[in-house]
A protein has these predicted regions:
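Signature of uroporphyrinogen-III synthase
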Residues: 1-232
Length: 232
């Protein structure tokens, strides 16, 4: 392991997360390798608010989707929610005070299994992003669900070429992986840290030196990198 630790985060970290590594002497480089933005128009607000008046089952797999929907709501929905753990669930609990979270999971695959286990659920609304994976929609459609998907935000790649040889790199999404490796390479010694299974799957195209979070959060990901570089 090299003497001076250089860590790249493919998403700008909170000051506290960056300080966790910097306080041990690591150099932390940060860049948002993807950009997300709501694509819901004022015209879409009517549909969102109409759905909010119905006691629907809905899916959120990203905090970005939660923010996009919340921005257009005129009142609190009374939805029954399935969501991804970590930041997505925390954002739902913060912004949607009247919803009922029926189930949450750390991955899309596990979340799909939990939704399928609810035999009373046959119609469901999925608030998704433009680059979402097919894991959940594929499983639900295969099982005969009436799935209404509404794309509420888009993800754009914002790569930057870096000449540094990093000790470790933090990845937060498959899109972030695609963005980084579109203009960069790594050495075989570089340790990669993944927020979850979908990101890990994308990283396996480039390396086998991958550590994955057991819980999808920035704090957990930084903690894994901390334990890797500063054990004991």
């Amino acid at each position: 392991m090299q003497s001076h630790i250089k860590i790249l985060s493919t998403k700008v970290l909170s000051p506290a997360s960056a300080a966790t590594l910097e306080n041990k002497g690591a150099s932390v480089f940060q860049h948002n390798f993807i950009k997300t933005e709501s694509i819901l128009t004022d015209a879409d607000a009517g549909l969102v608010n109409s759905l909010a008046q119905q006691g629907l089952h809905v899916i959120f797999t990203s905090a970005n989707a939660v923010y996009a929907v919340a921005e257009k709501l005129q009142f609190q929905p009374k939805w029954k929610v399935f969501c991804i753990n970590g930041k997505t669930r925390k954002t739902i609990e913060k912004l949607f005070t009247k919803v009922q979270i029926l189930d949450s999971s750390p991955t899309g695959e596990l979340l799909a299994e939990k939704i399928l286990a609810h035999s009373d659920v046959r119609h469901i609304v999925f608030f998704s992003g433009s680059r979402r994976l097919d894991t959940i929609p594929g499983a639900l459609l295969h099982a005969g669900f009436n799935l209404q998907e509404i794309v509420v935000y888009k993800t754009s790649l914002t790569p930057v070429q870096l000449d540094e040889n990093f000790s470790g790199i933090l990845f937060f999404s498959p899109s972030g992986v695609e963005s980084y490796f579109s203009v960069n390479r790594i050495s075989k010694e570089t340790a990669l840290f993944s927020i979850g299974p979908s990101t890990t799957k994308a990283l396996k195209n480039y390396s086998g030196n991958i550590s994955e979070c057991s819980f999808p959060s920035e704090e957990e990901l930084v903690g894994i990198a901390y334990g890797y570089f500063f054990p004991g």
